[in-house]
Structure formats: C-alpha cells, structure tokens
Amino acid sequence: MQDPNEDTEWNDILRDFGILPPKEESKDEIEEMVLRLQKEAMVKPFEKMTLAQLKEAEDEFDEEDMQAVETYRKKRLQEWKALKKKQKFGELREISGNQYVNEVTNAEEDVWVIIHLYRSSIPMCLLVNQHLSLLARKFPETKFVKAIVNSCIQHYHDNCLPTIFVYKNGQIEAKFIGIIECGGINLKLEELEWKLAEVGAIQTDLEENPRKDMVDMMVSSIRNTSIHDDSDSSNSDNDTK
C-alpha cells in the first residue's frame, strides 16, 4: 500500500483532488516554523515607533535595547530634519515692503525665492497669484512670496504688472515684467511652472514646454498664410499677363 505521507509527485496530485489526506508536517518543518515565528516575535517594538513614542517608552527598554534605540533615534531624527528642510515653505506668503530685504534679498543661503509684485485691481495679477499658490505647495523647497507693489516701489506703472522677480543668494536671477513676459492673459499653470523651471527656481517634472504646441500651430498658420499669399500673387501676375 502506498504511504500517503510519502513525498511523491503522484501523492501531491492525489492530495490536490482530495483523494489523500493533507500531508502531515514533519518534525523538522514544525521546528522551522516555530523558529520563524520566534524570530518575528523578536522584532524590536521601537523600530515601529515615532520619535515622540520613543521618548515616552525609553524607560521600558533595557540597556542593550537603549543602545539600539539611540541608533534608531538618530536615524529617525536625520530623516525628520531632511524632510523638514525639503518642506521648508509650501505656501505663497504675503509680505510688506519693509520685509523685502529680510524675506527676499537676505533669504536663506542657496534658497530660491520667487516674489510677485502685484495690484489686486489687475486680473492678470490675481491669476498669477492663483498659479503661484499652487506651485508653492508643489515645490515646498522654493520660497514663494507676494507683495502689493506700492508697499515696495512707489509710482510703479501698471503696464509693468504683474512683475515676478526670481532671487538666489541676494541676486536677481530672472525677472518677468508685464503681461507678455509673464505669459499672457491666458497663462496656464503649467506654462508658469515651465518658465520658473527654465531659470532653475524649481525642478519640474514637465518634459517639454506646454506652449510648444501653440507655437507650432502659430508657425504653421504663418507658413500657410505666406504660401496662400504667394499663390494669390502668382495668380494675379498670370491674370495680368
């Protein structure tokens, strides 16, 4: 008679069809499973804790645990500092003229600063503020601020608004003055993102200029118009003859 516990391919097939009972686990397999469960149970609880939880529970650890906890705490602290450094800003903040030097010119070293000088009565300025607010959340490592133009520069002409200055280490790295330079009255979020990425102020994930299709259409339209005009001119010359 065939041993139902014999480890053969045929027995495995019979078990799959329910003809033979499930194979009994050997002593070695049981011991291996027990050891695995014991190993999983030995995972230190502090490896799943936050910094605050580590602080609360530190009295419960023995000396050996405390050495591991301290190493783990330092690792978590470094991760936290790196995250805080990366997510330093994250919003479009309003500043006044007397804050300009501290917030913009003397901003933290190697931090990109984008400031929008605006007037709330100009629709294009409101559109730019709306886009910058979204970009500030998307790129928290870059500092985004806005200021009413009169608080910074007296008698600034409306035709120069909106005005966007891009600073780094106290220097103006780029500027966009007026509606045309800022992208036009139909400016889209992705177009402004591309402009700021081109000067290095943000690291975009856009792969190409969002206005490329529009530019291609304009060039094609101009080319077609030129061909049409040349054709009309040629036909006119033939008619004259």
Curated annotation (Swiss-Prot):
Belongs to the phosducin family. It comes from the Eukaryota. It comes from Homo sapiens. The keyword Endoplasmic reticulum applies. Pfam families: Phosducin. GO terms for biological process: acrosome assembly; protein folding; sperm axoneme assembly; spermatid development. Testis-specific. Keywords: Differentiation, Endoplasmic reticulum, Spermatogenesis. The keyword Chaperone does not apply. Residues 34-202 form the Phosducin domain. Its main location: endoplasmic reticulum. One of its GO terms (cellular component) is endoplasmic reticulum. InterPro entries: Phosducin-like_chap/apop_reg, Phosducin_thioredoxin-like_dom, Thioredoxin-like_sf. This is Phosducin-like protein 2. Residues 89-241 are annotated as: Thioredoxin fold. Essential for male fertility, spermiogenesis and acrosome formation.
